Design a protein with these regions (language model features):
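Peripheral/terminal regions associated with large enzymatic or DNA-binding modules
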Residues: 2-201
Length: 201
């Protein structure tokens, strides 16, 4: 379902080398969510939103983040309350995971990165187009072409790219807008979380 830019591997390899000694960088994202950020086309920015739709990792950093256990944060009421207030769409997904006994690695790792002040390097223009949100598969519904119609970088080489600073607050606001959670759903999520806590007691 994923279409890759001709320069995807060039982009990933370049940035794996550039950021290898920066322990705050968890991965190099190829995919960039349609946030509507205003920045140059050759720009990079940091985000906690790891995307499994094409990414590059360092084994050392991946192992370090993987050592954090899901239960370490899920059963912390303080952490989950912060998540509910600041990033409700992540609270929604994480609660659904535990309540329904399913696992979404991308959501799990996004929370781990937020808790550890870690980020993924992400291109302004996506290097990956996901065509799987057309309602034809079993995992994703139809998003009215939002992902399948994304402009993709079709250059053969990625060239020199420049990191642009975007505040975590601004990034979170954009994602909350993209993945808006209704008030009723938020109430249902709190109820599900309480049920999960009772189950574990």
């Amino acid at each position: 379902d994923n279409l890759f830019s001709p320069n995807f591997l060039d982009y990933v390899n370049q940035n794996l080398e550039i950021y290898k000694n920066d322990d705050s960088i968890f991965a190099i994202n190829g995919y960039s969510f349609p946030l509507g950020l205003e920045m140059p086309q050759n720009a990079l920015y940091k985000t906690f939103m790891y995307s499994p739709w094409g990414a590059g990792f360092w084994v050392r950093k991946y192992k370090a983040v993987s050592e954090i256990r899901f239960g370490d944060y899920f059963y912390s009421k303080k952490i989950m309350w912060q998540l509910f207030n600041k990033v409700p769409f992540l609270f929604d997904t994480v609660v659904s995971m535990e309540y329904s006994h399913v696992y979404y690695s991308d959501a799990d790792y996004r929370v781990r990165m937020l808790l550890n002040n870690m980020y993924c390097i992400t291109p302004a223009i996506t290097k990956v187009r996901n065509c799987g949100y057309d309602g034809s598969g079993i995992n994703c519904g139809n998003d009215d072409g939002k992902h399948a119609s994304q402009i993709i970088d079709n250059n053969v080489f990625c060239g020199e790219m420049e990191e642009v600073e975007v505040s975590v607050g601004a990034i979170i606001a954009k994602y909350n807008e993209l993945f808006e959670v209704s008030f009723i759903r938020k109430i249902k999520n709190i109820a599900k979380y309480v049920i999960c806590l009772v189950r574990n007691s």
